[in-house]
């Protein structure tokens, strides 16, 4: 999985929900998830910056895949990249299921009630078989 890459695009409405699209085999599904929160002034905060990012599965020194479940937050981590002028920006975001820690930076809602179910859903997203969480388009 370390060499796989996906493109992710984030757009937000006034309530902080991201407009998402999963493209798999030429079929498109529409969906949305909460990717930020709204402060008292009505501004979107704690969100991933709008625009296109590149998500890449990578390994950590233990050779364990980086997309692993955090026990307390019940989430997973990915590394996002995007071109900023002549350089690349890189950042990691914690992604957790709905009901975990809403409003934290980089929160992407993934519906899951327990760790095994969440892992299955993550696998489905990365395999292009689910319509949840992120705009994902597999890069060949």
Q: Over which residues does each language-model region extend?
A:
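Cell wall/extracellular polymer interaction/catalysis modules
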Residues: 1-105, 115-140
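Beta-rich, blade/repeat-based domains predominating
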Residues: 109-110
């Amino acid at each position: 999985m370390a060499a796989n890459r996906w493109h992710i695009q984030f757009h937000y409405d006034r309530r902080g929900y991201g407009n998402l699209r999963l493209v798999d085999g030429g079929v498109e599904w529409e969906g949305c998830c909460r990717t930020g929160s709204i402060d008292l002034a009505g501004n979107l905060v704690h969100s991933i910056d709008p625009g296109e990012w590149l998500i890449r599965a990578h390994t950590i020194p233990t050779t364990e895949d980086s997309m692993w479940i955090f026990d307390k937050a019940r989430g997973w981590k990915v590394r996002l990249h995007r071109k900023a002028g002549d350089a690349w920006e890189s950042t990691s975001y914690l992604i957790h299921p709905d009901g975990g820690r809403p409003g934290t930076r980089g929160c992407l809602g993934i519906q899951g009630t327990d760790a095994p179910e969440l892992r299955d859903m993550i696998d489905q997203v990365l395999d292009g078989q689910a319509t949840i969480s992120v705009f994902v388009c597999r890069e060949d």
